[in-house]
Amino acid sequence: MQNFNYPHLSYWQKEIQNRDFEHNRNAQPSRLCAVDVIKAISNYTKTLLPIVATEVGQHQVAVVNNFEINEPRKLLTSGGFGAMGFGFPAAIGACVWQDKFPVICITGDGSFQMNLPELAVCMDYNLPVKVFIINNGSLGLVRQLQEEQCEERYFETAISSPDYVKLSQSYGIDAIRVDKHCDIMPALECAFKNKSPFVVEFMTVSDEKV
């Protein structure tokens, strides 16, 4: 927000900049949380000025609260409609539209299953989209709502997923899986050194709150 100057909003801008977005994430050193992953991606790509597309869910909230984006038209997200399946096609479109900035798709294991066959488009046209899957084994935002507003009466939020690494590789796309904090940065280095599409699956906790 430092690049925008709206005097009548100065108090609110200061409030946002000073606000601590750390929520109860049930964080433990041995557990990988989505917020930690998002912050790591943001820090790594700060000088790359990426275009960031998100799907819909907890990862989307984590991106909005923790990913540093200081330029217009750099965040593509379905905020009003909340349409799962929006982010990956949006990232592909951004890649087709321009090649100056890297394009990132941050998605969840639920949302990615809406449009994962589009991996074929990335491969066919060699679109270097970096897909980061936050896999918590659930529809996390719905689960959080059921926990907080429905007295933990969980219903249809735990989901099964394919092996995203093998699935990506079956399309001819390189992919790796990360389940430890120490492996986040090496995975990002590997993804961005690769000039082709690349998938990283982050295995995160299922009880995180954002």
Where are these regions (language model features)?
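Glycine-rich, acidic loop regions that bind phosphate or pyrophosphate groups
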Residues: 1-11
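Active-site diphosphate/adenylate-binding microenvironment
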Residues: 13-89, 94
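A diffuse structural propensity rather than consistent per-protein peaks
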Residues: 5, 30-33, 39, 163, ...
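Thiamine diphosphate
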Residues: 1, 62-210
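Generic low-complexity, intrinsically disordered sequence content enriched
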Residues: 10-13, 20, 143, 192
